[in-house]
Amino acid sequence: MAHQLKLLKDDFFASDQQAVAVADRYPQDVFAEHTHDFCELVIVWRGNGLHVLNDRPYRITRGDLFYIHADDKHSYASVNDLVLQNIIYCPERLKLNLDWQGAIPGFNASAGQPHWRLGSVGMAQARQVIGQLEHESSQHVPFANEMAELLFGQLVMLLNRHRYTSDSLPPTSSETLLDKLITRLAASLKSPFALDKFCDEASCSERVLRQQFRQQTGMTINQYLRQVRVCHAQYLLQHSRLLISDISTECGFEDSNYFSVVFTRETGMTPSQWRHLNSQKD
Protein backbone atom coordinates (compact mmCIF):
# COMPACT_ATOMS: atom_id res chain seq x y z
CA MET A 1 0.00 0.00 0.00
CA ALA A 2 1.27 3.46 -0.89
CA HIS A 3 2.39 5.66 1.96
CA GLN A 4 -0.37 8.03 3.10
CA LEU A 5 0.57 11.70 2.75
CA LYS A 6 0.18 13.52 6.07
CA LEU A 7 0.31 17.29 6.51
CA LEU A 8 2.02 18.37 9.74
CA LYS A 9 1.47 21.23 12.20
CA ASP A 10 5.09 22.34 12.02
CA ASP A 11 4.67 23.25 8.34
CA PHE A 12 1.54 25.37 8.82
CA PHE A 13 1.65 26.96 12.29
CA ALA A 14 4.15 29.62 13.33
CA SER A 15 4.65 28.17 16.82
CA ASP A 16 3.38 25.44 19.12
CA GLN A 17 1.29 28.12 20.87
CA GLN A 18 -0.68 29.02 17.77
CA ALA A 19 -4.10 27.34 17.67
CA VAL A 20 -5.56 28.79 14.46
CA ALA A 21 -4.31 29.88 11.03
CA VAL A 22 -5.68 30.47 7.53
CA ALA A 23 -4.40 28.69 4.43
CA ASP A 24 -5.56 30.25 1.16
CA ARG A 25 -6.00 28.25 -2.00
CA TYR A 26 -6.21 30.83 -4.80
CA PRO A 27 -6.82 28.66 -6.73
CA GLN A 28 -6.84 25.15 -5.26
CA ASP A 29 -4.78 22.78 -7.42
CA VAL A 30 -5.22 19.05 -7.71
CA PHE A 31 -4.11 17.62 -4.34
CA ALA A 32 -3.46 13.94 -3.64
CA GLU A 33 -5.26 12.10 -0.85
CA HIS A 34 -3.91 13.09 2.55
CA THR A 35 -4.60 13.38 6.26
CA HIS A 36 -3.33 15.92 8.82
CA ASP A 37 -2.29 16.18 12.44
CA PHE A 38 -4.60 19.22 12.72
CA CYS A 39 -8.23 19.93 11.77
CA GLU A 40 -9.70 22.35 9.27
CA LEU A 41 -12.79 24.15 8.06
CA VAL A 42 -13.05 24.44 4.27
CA ILE A 43 -15.15 27.14 2.61
CA VAL A 44 -15.48 27.27 -1.19
CA TRP A 45 -15.80 30.74 -2.71
CA ARG A 46 -16.11 30.01 -6.44
CA GLY A 47 -15.27 27.61 -9.26
CA ASN A 48 -15.72 23.87 -8.96
CA GLY A 49 -13.89 20.64 -8.33
CA LEU A 50 -14.17 17.09 -7.08
CA HIS A 51 -13.60 16.74 -3.33
CA VAL A 52 -13.29 13.14 -2.14
CA LEU A 53 -13.69 12.91 1.64
CA ASN A 54 -13.29 9.49 3.29
CA ASP A 55 -13.99 7.83 -0.08
CA ARG A 56 -17.16 9.85 -0.66
CA PRO A 57 -17.05 12.17 -3.71
CA TYR A 58 -18.59 15.64 -3.62
CA ARG A 59 -18.86 17.97 -6.60
CA ILE A 60 -18.10 21.25 -4.85
CA THR A 61 -18.73 24.86 -5.79
CA ARG A 62 -19.44 28.25 -4.17
CA GLY A 63 -20.98 27.95 -0.72
CA ASP A 64 -19.83 24.44 0.12
CA LEU A 65 -18.59 24.07 3.70
CA PHE A 66 -16.68 21.11 5.14
CA TYR A 67 -15.59 20.26 8.67
CA ILE A 68 -12.45 18.11 8.34
CA HIS A 69 -11.04 16.14 11.28
CA ALA A 70 -7.34 15.34 11.46
CA ASP A 71 -7.88 11.65 10.74
CA ASP A 72 -10.14 12.26 7.75
CA LYS A 73 -8.57 11.50 4.39
CA HIS A 74 -9.44 13.74 1.48
CA SER A 75 -8.26 14.89 -1.93
CA TYR A 76 -9.08 17.38 -4.69
CA ALA A 77 -9.35 16.52 -8.39
CA SER A 78 -10.92 17.84 -11.62
CA VAL A 79 -10.54 21.42 -10.39
CA ASN A 80 -11.72 24.39 -12.44
CA ASP A 81 -10.81 27.83 -11.04
CA LEU A 82 -11.56 26.40 -7.60
CA VAL A 83 -11.04 29.08 -4.95
CA LEU A 84 -11.34 28.10 -1.30
CA GLN A 85 -9.92 28.82 2.13
CA ASN A 86 -8.82 26.38 4.79
CA ILE A 87 -9.14 27.60 8.36
CA ILE A 88 -6.83 25.21 10.17
CA TYR A 89 -6.82 24.65 13.91
CA CYS A 90 -5.45 22.40 16.65
CA PRO A 91 -8.24 21.38 19.07
CA GLU A 92 -5.81 20.68 21.90
CA ARG A 93 -4.44 24.24 21.72
CA LEU A 94 -7.80 26.03 21.98
CA LYS A 95 -8.14 27.84 25.32
CA LEU A 96 -11.41 29.72 24.89
CA ASN A 97 -14.22 28.31 27.02
CA LEU A 98 -16.70 27.60 24.22
CA ASP A 99 -18.77 24.53 23.42
CA TRP A 100 -16.49 23.61 20.54
CA GLN A 101 -17.86 20.09 20.31
CA GLY A 102 -21.42 21.37 20.05
CA ALA A 103 -20.54 23.89 17.36
CA ILE A 104 -18.09 21.92 15.21
CA PRO A 105 -19.34 18.63 13.72
CA GLY A 106 -16.74 15.92 14.24
CA PHE A 107 -14.80 17.89 16.86
CA ASN A 108 -12.39 15.54 18.69
CA ALA A 109 -13.53 12.71 16.40
CA SER A 110 -17.14 12.87 17.62
CA ALA A 111 -19.86 11.91 15.15
CA GLY A 112 -21.05 14.72 12.93
CA GLN A 113 -22.09 15.60 9.41
CA PRO A 114 -19.04 16.95 7.56
CA HIS A 115 -20.73 18.63 4.57
CA TRP A 116 -22.93 21.73 4.76
CA ARG A 117 -23.69 24.78 2.66
CA LEU A 118 -23.58 28.53 3.19
CA GLY A 119 -25.76 31.03 1.37
CA SER A 120 -24.58 34.41 0.16
CA VAL A 121 -25.38 36.16 3.45
CA GLY A 122 -23.39 33.67 5.52
CA MET A 123 -20.54 33.70 3.01
CA ALA A 124 -20.24 37.48 3.13
CA GLN A 125 -20.13 37.54 6.93
CA ALA A 126 -17.69 34.62 7.07
CA ARG A 127 -15.37 36.25 4.54
CA GLN A 128 -15.13 39.38 6.68
CA VAL A 129 -14.25 37.45 9.85
CA ILE A 130 -11.78 35.22 7.99
CA GLY A 131 -10.02 38.33 6.67
CA GLN A 132 -9.57 39.59 10.23
CA LEU A 133 -8.51 36.13 11.39
CA GLU A 134 -5.95 35.80 8.62
CA HIS A 135 -4.46 39.18 9.49
CA GLU A 136 -4.34 38.49 13.22
CA SER A 137 -2.90 34.98 12.89
CA SER A 138 0.02 36.34 10.86
CA GLN A 139 0.94 38.99 13.45
CA HIS A 140 3.93 38.69 15.77
CA VAL A 141 2.61 41.00 18.46
CA PRO A 142 1.35 40.45 22.02
CA PHE A 143 -1.98 38.60 22.28
CA ALA A 144 -2.13 37.81 18.55
CA ASN A 145 -2.91 34.15 19.27
CA GLU A 146 -5.63 35.08 21.74
CA MET A 147 -7.20 37.53 19.28
CA ALA A 148 -7.06 34.92 16.53
CA GLU A 149 -8.81 32.38 18.74
CA LEU A 150 -11.54 34.89 19.60
CA LEU A 151 -12.11 35.49 15.90
CA PHE A 152 -12.13 31.75 15.26
CA GLY A 153 -14.81 31.36 17.92
CA GLN A 154 -16.83 34.09 16.23
CA LEU A 155 -16.43 32.35 12.87
CA VAL A 156 -17.48 28.96 14.25
CA MET A 157 -20.65 30.43 15.77
CA LEU A 158 -21.39 32.38 12.61
CA LEU A 159 -21.11 29.22 10.51
CA ASN A 160 -23.32 27.42 13.01
CA ARG A 161 -25.96 30.12 12.56
CA HIS A 162 -25.92 30.23 8.75
CA ARG A 163 -25.14 26.70 7.60
CA TYR A 164 -27.78 24.39 6.20
CA THR A 165 -27.86 20.93 4.66
CA SER A 166 -27.17 20.89 0.94
CA ASP A 167 -30.74 20.07 -0.09
CA SER A 168 -32.78 22.08 2.43
CA LEU A 169 -32.38 25.85 2.50
CA PRO A 170 -34.56 27.16 5.37
CA PRO A 171 -37.92 28.42 4.08
CA THR A 172 -37.50 31.75 5.90
CA SER A 173 -34.07 32.31 4.37
CA SER A 174 -33.31 35.58 2.62
CA GLU A 175 -30.64 33.98 0.47
CA THR A 176 -30.12 34.78 -3.20
CA LEU A 177 -31.72 33.10 -6.17
CA LEU A 178 -28.44 31.33 -6.94
CA ASP A 179 -28.38 29.80 -3.45
CA LYS A 180 -31.95 28.61 -3.89
CA LEU A 181 -31.13 27.14 -7.30
CA ILE A 182 -28.15 25.15 -5.99
CA THR A 183 -30.29 23.85 -3.13
CA ARG A 184 -33.06 22.82 -5.54
CA LEU A 185 -30.53 21.02 -7.73
CA ALA A 186 -29.16 19.11 -4.73
CA ALA A 187 -32.73 18.06 -3.89
CA SER A 188 -33.25 16.79 -7.46
CA LEU A 189 -31.03 13.71 -7.32
CA LYS A 190 -33.91 11.33 -8.05
CA SER A 191 -36.48 13.62 -9.63
CA PRO A 192 -36.36 15.63 -12.86
CA PHE A 193 -35.40 19.29 -12.63
CA ALA A 194 -37.09 21.85 -14.87
CA LEU A 195 -35.26 25.18 -15.00
CA ASP A 196 -38.13 26.92 -16.77
CA LYS A 197 -40.49 25.96 -13.95
CA PHE A 198 -37.98 27.17 -11.33
CA CYS A 199 -37.63 30.51 -13.13
CA ASP A 200 -41.39 30.89 -13.41
CA GLU A 201 -41.75 30.32 -9.66
CA ALA A 202 -38.96 32.81 -8.94
CA SER A 203 -40.08 35.33 -11.59
CA CYS A 204 -36.58 35.55 -13.01
CA SER A 205 -34.89 35.42 -16.40
CA GLU A 206 -33.67 31.95 -17.37
CA ARG A 207 -30.89 33.42 -19.51
CA VAL A 208 -29.61 35.69 -16.73
CA LEU A 209 -29.72 32.87 -14.18
CA ARG A 210 -27.75 30.57 -16.49
CA GLN A 211 -25.10 33.26 -16.96
CA GLN A 212 -24.89 33.97 -13.24
CA PHE A 213 -24.59 30.28 -12.39
CA ARG A 214 -21.78 29.74 -14.87
CA GLN A 215 -19.94 32.87 -13.75
CA GLN A 216 -19.95 31.77 -10.10
CA THR A 217 -19.41 28.02 -10.51
CA GLY A 218 -17.55 27.57 -13.78
CA MET A 219 -20.18 25.07 -14.95
CA THR A 220 -23.52 25.06 -16.68
CA ILE A 221 -26.56 24.13 -14.62
CA ASN A 222 -26.91 20.82 -16.47
CA GLN A 223 -23.22 19.98 -15.96
CA TYR A 224 -23.51 20.59 -12.23
CA LEU A 225 -26.63 18.48 -11.82
CA ARG A 226 -25.16 15.67 -13.90
CA GLN A 227 -21.93 15.63 -11.90
CA VAL A 228 -23.76 15.75 -8.54
CA ARG A 229 -25.75 12.71 -9.67
CA VAL A 230 -22.63 10.88 -10.82
CA CYS A 231 -20.96 11.56 -7.44
CA HIS A 232 -23.98 10.07 -5.68
CA ALA A 233 -23.83 7.07 -8.00
CA GLN A 234 -20.14 6.56 -7.19
CA TYR A 235 -20.97 6.51 -3.50
CA LEU A 236 -23.83 4.02 -3.94
CA LEU A 237 -21.74 1.76 -6.17
CA GLN A 238 -19.06 1.53 -3.51
CA HIS A 239 -21.16 1.46 -0.35
CA SER A 240 -24.39 -0.32 -1.29
CA ARG A 241 -25.43 -3.58 -2.91
CA LEU A 242 -28.08 -2.01 -5.10
CA LEU A 243 -28.26 -3.20 -8.69
CA ILE A 244 -26.78 -0.78 -11.20
CA SER A 245 -30.24 -0.32 -12.72
CA ASP A 246 -31.59 0.67 -9.29
CA ILE A 247 -28.69 3.07 -8.72
CA SER A 248 -29.48 4.62 -12.08
CA THR A 249 -33.03 5.32 -10.88
CA GLU A 250 -31.83 6.58 -7.48
CA CYS A 251 -29.64 9.10 -9.27
CA GLY A 252 -32.30 10.50 -11.56
CA PHE A 253 -31.57 8.53 -14.73
CA GLU A 254 -34.67 6.92 -16.22
CA ASP A 255 -32.63 4.81 -18.62
CA SER A 256 -29.81 2.65 -17.21
CA ASN A 257 -28.01 2.53 -20.57
CA TYR A 258 -27.90 6.32 -20.70
CA PHE A 259 -26.70 6.32 -17.08
CA SER A 260 -23.82 4.02 -18.05
CA VAL A 261 -22.87 6.29 -20.95
CA VAL A 262 -22.87 9.42 -18.76
CA PHE A 263 -21.05 7.69 -15.89
CA THR A 264 -18.34 6.36 -18.22
CA ARG A 265 -17.88 9.75 -19.84
CA GLU A 266 -17.51 11.48 -16.46
CA THR A 267 -15.30 8.92 -14.68
CA GLY A 268 -13.46 7.05 -17.44
CA MET A 269 -14.89 3.67 -16.44
CA THR A 270 -18.21 1.86 -16.50
CA PRO A 271 -20.35 1.61 -13.34
CA SER A 272 -19.46 -2.08 -12.96
CA GLN A 273 -15.74 -1.34 -13.35
CA TRP A 274 -16.03 1.43 -10.75
CA ARG A 275 -17.81 -0.89 -8.33
CA HIS A 276 -15.24 -3.65 -8.76
CA LEU A 277 -12.24 -1.33 -8.37
CA ASN A 278 -13.58 0.51 -5.33
CA SER A 279 -15.02 -2.52 -3.55
CA GLN A 280 -11.42 -3.59 -3.03
CA LYS A 281 -10.89 -0.51 -0.80
CA ASP A 282 -13.58 -1.51 1.72
From Swiss-Prot:
Gene3D superfamilies: Homeodomain-like, Jelly Rolls. Keywords: Activator, Cytoplasm, DNA-binding, Repeat, Rhamnose metabolism, Transcription, Transcription regulation. The keyword Transcription applies. One of its GO terms (biological process) is rhamnose metabolic process. The record marks 246 as: Interaction with sigma-70. The keyword Repeat applies. One of its GO terms (molecular function) is sequence-specific DNA binding. It is found in: Cytoplasm. SUPFAM superfamilies: Homeodomain-like (SSF46689), RmlC-like cupins (SSF51182). CDD domains: cupin_RhaR_RhaS-like_N. Residues 196-217, 244-267 bind DNA. Residues 179-277 form the HTH araC/xylS-type domain. GO terms for cellular component: cytoplasm. Activates expression of the rhaSR operon in response to L-rhamnose. NCBIfam families: PRK13500.1 (NF010025), PRK13501.1 (NF010026), PRK13502.1 (NF010027). Binds DNA as a dimer. This is HTH-type transcriptional activator RhaR. It comes from Escherichia coli O1:K1 / APEC.
